[in-house]
Amino acid sequence: MYKRQLLPLLDQPCPVERMSVVYALGRNPCPTAVEKLVSLLETDDNAYVRRATAWSLANYDNQIVLKPLINALKNDVAAVRLWSSSSLAEIGNVSLRNAQLAAEQLLISLKIDNEPGVRSNCIWSLCRLYEKLNNTFQESFVDECTKIALFDKEPSVMEEAKTALDSMGMQGFYN
């Protein structure tokens, strides 16, 4: 009951209030909130609210959250992209179809995003989805991780790629 009482607070003018409610609804999912949360991710003018929403949507396995999270990973500011990439791992684990759709954008973002934290999270998320992906996609991910582990300019992303390769049973594959 109390979760439904939170929903009107998502329309408050103060972004701190909206963000607090979004986090509360992420920790305590309310199925009736999912459409409003998606709307906030897509339209709220405050990046902190959108970031909180991207995080919270990981706890909603409703199909409608997949596309907005993918769009946020493509188009939003770095903090929102970072949490969108992590949330896509959770939503991707709901079904094979979700896993494939999420992984496609995660791999693209891994290749083109200029923010190391986002790229590292894309690697982490793809590792979480790895077992659900088809062999061709798994091979593409391993190839990309190998390139990153050997040649990336960002040490933190290189280390994440090495950790990913190790977790997939390819210890030392990048040496």
Q: What are the language-model segments listed below?
A:
Residues 3-11, 30-42, 62-74, 93-110, ...:
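Amphipathic alpha-helical scaffolding segments comprising HEAT/armadillo-like alpha-solenoid repeats
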Residues 8, 16-30, 39, 48-62, ...:
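Structural detector for internal amphipathic alpha-helices that build alpha-solenoid repeat scaffolds
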Residues 13-14, 45-46, 76-77, 114-115, ...:
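Short inter-helical turns and helix N-cap capping residues of alpha-solenoid HEAT/ARM repeat scaffolds
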Residues 80-83, 144-153:
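Short, highly charged low-complexity linear segments
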